[in-house]
Amino acid sequence: MSDRVCVGAVAGAFGVRGELRIKSFCAVPEDIASYNPLSFEDGRETTLRLTGQIKNGLSGRLTGVSNKEAADALRGARLYAPRDRLPRLPDDEFYHADLIGLAVHDTGGTLLGKVAAVHNHGAGDLLELRGPGLKGSVLLPFTRAVVPTVDLDAGRIVADPPEGLF
């Protein structure tokens, strides 16, 4: 497990004075600023100060960003928080970052693939699986009925996929 977790991303500039559109991946979107200092993928640290709520996200300022050009240059940049600053999760909840890369086996032990991404389009989380024998990606509902076991220490997920999915 990484010592950093992606908690948001820069969606682009907001205005001409260096404000940014921030997409928070936190359960409570405004909590993203409470995990300061944040860092970029390359490890550079920054501090986020939220300035308001806007359509599809938040507006805010990052240290060192003072104009639209600097804000535009950060479009798509991911923001990371130190894992030890994040709340401890109950046993049946997981950070998406911890699921990516885990091997997924069916209840008979056959490897189905590895988790490539975790998506949520409003109706619940979906695990995107890729692997040998799959023509492309397969989306597996991340529910207790379909995914009864997640063992982070062993790097393994046991799934009971719906009939006909594989």
Swiss-Prot record:
Q: Does the keyword Endoplasmic reticulum apply?
A: no
Q: Which InterPro entries match?
A: PRC_barrel-like_sf, PRC_RimM, RimM, RimM_N, RimM_N_sf, Transl_B-barrel_sf
UniProt subcellular location? Cytoplasm
| GO terms classed as biological process | ribosomal small subunit biogenesis; rRNA processing
Q: PRC barrel domain: from which residue to which, for each copy?
A: 91-165
Q: Which Pfam families match?
A: PRC_RimM, RimM
Q: Give the GO cellular component terms, alphabetically.
A: cytoplasm; ribosome
Which Gene Ontology molecular-function terms are recorded? ribosome binding
UniProt entry keywords in alphabetical sequence: Chaperone, Cytoplasm, Ribosome biogenesis, rRNA processing
Q: What domain comment accompanies this record?
A: The PRC barrel domain binds ribosomal protein uS19.
Q: How does it assemble?
A: Binds ribosomal protein uS19.
- What does the UniProt function comment say about this protein? An accessory protein needed during the final step in the assembly of 30S ribosomal subunit, possibly for assembly of the head region. Essential for efficient processing of 16S rRNA. May be needed both before and after RbfA during the maturation of 16S rRNA. It has affinity for free ribosomal 30S subunits but not for 70S ribosomes.
Q: Which family does it belong to?
A: Belongs to the RimM family.
- What is the name listed in the Swiss-Prot or TrEMBL entry for this protein? Ribosome maturation factor RimM
Organism this protein belongs to:
Dinoroseobacter shibae (strain DSM 16493 / NCIMB 14021 / DFL 12)
